[in-house]
Curated annotation (Swiss-Prot):
Keywords: Electron transport, Membrane, Mitochondrion, Mitochondrion inner membrane, NAD, Respiratory chain, Translocase, Transmembrane, Transmembrane helix, Transport, Ubiquinone. Its EC number is 7.1.1.2. Its main location: mitochondrion. It is a multi-pass membrane protein. This is NADH-ubiquinone oxidoreductase chain 5. The chain crosses the membrane at residues 1-21, 30-50, 81-101, 113-133, 135-155, 177-197, 211-233, 241-261, 274-294, 309-329, 330-350, 364-384, 408-428, 451-471, 475-497, 509-529, 610-630, 637-657. It comes from Emericella nidulans (Aspergillus nidulans). Belongs to the complex I subunit 5 family. The gene is nd5. Core subunit of the mitochondrial membrane respiratory chain NADH dehydrogenase (Complex I) that is believed to belong to the minimal assembly required for catalysis. Complex I functions in the transfer of electrons from NADH to the respiratory chain. The immediate electron acceptor for the enzyme is believed to be ubiquinone. It catalyses: a ubiquinone + NADH + 5 H(+)(in) = a ubiquinol + NAD(+) + 4 H(+)(out).
């Protein structure tokens, strides 16, 4: 069952990609969707067997590397963390496959698209099932390549080309540091197998663990789009909307958080790395919410809401890895629902993505409105919605730690939650509730999608409504044996007891009260005092504030001016001096020129004069006699004579070269 679970998406990708012309569009749809849905059913069975019964499974496939002391086996590992990621990845992926049948129905490259989707899913499975860092790195890299292919799916668009390259190159920064971290693990521990590294971690110097942890954290920062290496995130919206749902909900962005959770027994021994995770997650949460508030493109706004993965990084910094996993699962479902709902809106209004030109779509898209309302309520952690059970718990856990950093992070993340609520209300209000602002033709043709588009929305909404309440005791219940991903227990992991019983009620309710209050005030101002907002926007202060946040804190401008430009100049000089300089001089260009000069010089020795030929014969005779003589005497003198003759005969060659 477990091998079938792994291999089915790959088979679907191969058939759709290489035999697409034979099976046709319908055949590609059928094969890829059936393979992924079957894999999802098997993943649910694996979740019940491995997760609930707490029976880890390992499958030894083959020996991969056997080089001196490095011995790497290709082993697939199924434990609580792996099967939880399976549920997240495969349920969302199967629904995205079904949704894409209708959404991409008019695209001429359906087979290629579904092949990429299935390959993406397969490599994500490889990433989470690997038993060592090297197998994980294989999935990590190919997932990045698949994201490049999917974002650049419409390769005739220049914007898609630029965005895919930006995503690929930004992730290369994190991949480079992750590679350095893997080499540091290999150098320090002599192995890259999870079990070996985690078993030896308590006996190593904290500085070594800190260095490795920082490298892993930077790798996760790039993949999970934390602040600093987040610039690829909105640009990845150039791909089709189902791609955005798959990348930003369940696959690529969760890979970085998965790496931190998988490495929890290692980074737990470095307080520096945990504090860095804590602050990185908090800053990312506020940063993304402020930028998202000033975005006007529907998909880009939801892209910045994906940076709410900072909440999971906060949970990692609090050593509450099971809480991070719980929020990851919840986040995947409601974020996929938001993106697929956005795709339904874009599909209905002739591909227009500026939600300022929507308005009044509630009457035309009632199903889409309700599913996006449900997902938005979860995003802002309204009580008894799925996001409430994990997001608010993370905030309460931060306050429940009772030390300075976590308390400050609680208030910082609360501010981020406030602005997240504000832009969620902004999207719903301007898209569905306000007066129509778009052209009449959009409303004439606006309609809900067909069965393939609406069914995934309904399924996700049902899963989303019930999953948080049903699974909260499984993932973070005090008596559960499921969340055994910390590998060991210490008093710091019992933070949930303090969170549950010791945190004052005021601080439990504060994020919700502030979020709802700010949203209500903003809607009232927009509805009853619009001139006040317009006058403020056109004032110098309002203009500067709007420009600052709309330009994303000028971080991309800083990168382009001071980093990218310098790197390009350095690359140009390096290419000029090495690739176009010394390498060519010593390589094909220089060798060709030297041989040509040598042949020309030798050709000039032929003068057609008898006395010259007699001189050559005499020199050759003297050479052979001296060869016999000096072989029995001083070899150094012989070498000196040979060198002198060579210099005399080739003086012209050397000067010319």
């Amino acid at each position: 069952m477990y091998l079938t679970l792994i291999i089915l998406p790959l088979l679907g990708s191969i058939v759709s990609g290489f035999f697409g012309r034979k099976v046709g569009v319908t055949g590609a749809h059928l094969i890829t969707c059936v393979s992924v849905v079957t894999t999802t059913i098997l993943a649910i069975l694996a979740f019940l067997e491995v997760g609930f019964n707490n029976i880890p499974v390992t499958i030894n496939i083959a020996r991969w590397l056997d080089v001196e002391s490095l011995y790497v086996l290709w082993i697939f590992r199924f434990d609580s963390l792996t099967v939880s990621m399976f549920i997240t990845v495969l349920i969302v992926s199967s629904l995205v496959h079904i949704y894409s049948i209708s959404y991409m129905s008019h695209d001429p490259h359906n087979q290629r698209f579904f092949s990429y989707l299935s390959l993406f899913t397969f490599m994500m499975i490889i990433l989470v099932t690997g038993n060592n860092y090297l197998i994980m790195f294989v999935g990590w890299e190919v997932v990045g390549v698949c994201s490049y292919l999917l974002v650049n799916f419409w390769f005739t668009r220049i914007a898609a080309n630029q965005s895919s390259l930006s995503a690929l190159l930004t992730n290369r920064v994190g991949d480079t540091l992750l590679t350095v971290g893997m080499f540091a693990i290999l150098w320090s521990f002599g192995n890259i197998d999870y079990s070996t590294v985690f078993a030896l971690a308590p006996y190593y110097n904290e500085n070594i663990i800190t260095l490795i942890g920082i490298c892993l954290l930077i790798g996760a920062t790039a993949k999970s789009s934390q602040v600093g290496l987040h610039i690829w995130l909105p640009q990845a919206m150039e791909g089709p909307t189902p791609v955005s749902a798959l990348i930003h909900a369940a696959t690529m962005v969760t890979a970085g958080v998965y790496l931190l959770m998988r490495s929890s027994p290692l980074i737990e021994y470095s307080s520096t790395v945990l504090v860095l995770c804590l602050w990185l997650g908090a800053i990312t949460t506020v940063f993304s919410s402020l930028i998202g508030l000033f975005q006007q493109i529907l998909k880009k706004l939801f892209a910045y809401s994906t940076m709410q993965l900072g909440m999971m990084v906060i949970a990692v910094g609090l050593s509450s890895y099971n809480l991070a996993l719980f929020h990851l699962v919840n986040h995947a479902f409601y974020k996929a629902l938001l993106f697929l709902g956005a795709g339904s809106v874009i599909h209905a209004v002739a591909d227009n993505q500026d939600f300022r030109k929507y308005g009044g779509l509630r009457e035309f898209l009632p199903l889409t409105y309700y599913v996006m309302l449900i997902a938005s309520l979860s995003l802002v952690a309204v009580p008894f919605m799925t996001g409430f059970y994990s997001k608010d718990y993370i905030l309460e856990s931060a306050y429940g730690q009772y030390y300075l950093s976590s308390t400050i992070v609680y208030f910082v993340a609360t501010i981020g939650a406030m602005f997240t609520t504000l832009y969620s209300a902004k999207v719903l209000y301007l898209t569905f509730l306000t007066n129509p602002n778009g052209p009449l033709v959009n409303y004439k043709h606006a309609h809900e999608g067909d069965l393939f588009m609406t069914t995934p929305l309904i399924i996700l909404a049902i899963i989303y409504i019930h999953s948080g309440y049903i699974t909260k005791d499984i993932f973070i219940g005090l008596g559960t044996g499921f969340s055994l991903i910390n590998s060991y227990y210490s008093p710091s992991h019992e933070i949930m007891l303090d969170t549950e019983f010791a945190v004052p009620t005021l601080f439990k309710l504060l994020p919700f009260i502030l979020s709802i209050s700010l949203s209500v005030i903003s809607v009232l101002l927009s509805e009853f005092l619009p001139k006040l907002l317009i006058n403020f926007k056109f004032s110098r202060l309002g203009y500067n504030i709007f420009s600052f946040f709309n330009q994303r804190f000028y971080i991309e401008l800083f990168y382009n001016k001071y980093i990218v430009e310098g790197v390009l100049k350095l690359g140009g000089q390096t290419s000029k001096s090495l690739d176009k300089g010394s390498v060519e001089l010593l390589g094909p260009y220089g060798l060709e020129k030297a041989l040509l000069s040598l042949s020309n010089s030798i050709g000039k020795l032929s003068t057609s004069v008898v006395t010259t030929y007699a001189l050559y014969i005499l020199i050759g005779l003297i050479f052979y006699i001296s060869l016999l003589y000096f072989s029995y005497n001083d070899n150094n003198l012989f070498i000196l004579v040979i060198f002198t003759l060579f210099v005399l005969l080739n003086n012209n060659i050397i000067n010319k070269f």
